[in-house]
Design a protein with these regions (language model features):
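Short helix/turn-capping signatures at newly exposed starts of structured segments
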Residues: 1-144
Length: 144
């Protein structure tokens, strides 16, 4: 479930809440089995590719990005869904199909293409390329 007024994502099975104050340590402790890959970057960012069960019995592919210990952003890829947390990563999908699936999922929850909350914003991003710039729902967080 996403509480857009507060910018909180509550996972269904674990009931773990991802907030602007979530740290990498808290994420890895709460959902270790759902994290498929961790990519540290030389600029201080670390990307956690994982499956998040935002809806009951529906896992979405996501990339959770931290800069140091600060949560920077979450990219949700609703075009990649599964009833169980499946393989290490989803297969690429053509741009048009991913746009249609992503926009339909976003429209179920949000009425506007961009919304803000006290410490960030959420918006729908129509992708241009299935690998380097895929369709996603982008949640950005700001520091205190």
């Amino acid at each position: 479930m996403i509480d857009i007024k507060q910018g909180i994502i509550t996972l269904c099975e674990s009931e773990f809440q991802i907030t602007a104050d979530t740290t990498p340590q808290a994420l890895t402790a709460a959902i270790p089995a759902l994290i498929s890959q961790v990519h540290p970057v030389s600029t201080g960012y670390t990307h956690y590719n994982c499956w998040l069960d935002i809806e009951p019995q529906c896992y979405l592919w996501a990339s959770v990005c931290f800069h140091g210990d600060a949560l920077e952003s979450i990219r949700l890829f609703p075009q990649h869904q599964s009833a169980t947390a499946p393989a290490p990563r989803p297969d690429p999908m053509d741009t048009e199909s991913s746009h249609l699936l992503g926009h339909a999922w976003y429209g179920k929850f949000f009425e506007q293409d961009e919304l803000s909350f006290p410490r960030g914003s959420i918006r729908y991003v129509q992708g241009r390329d299935p690998i380097y710039s895929p369709t996603c729902v982008l949640i950005r967080y700001t520091s205190k």
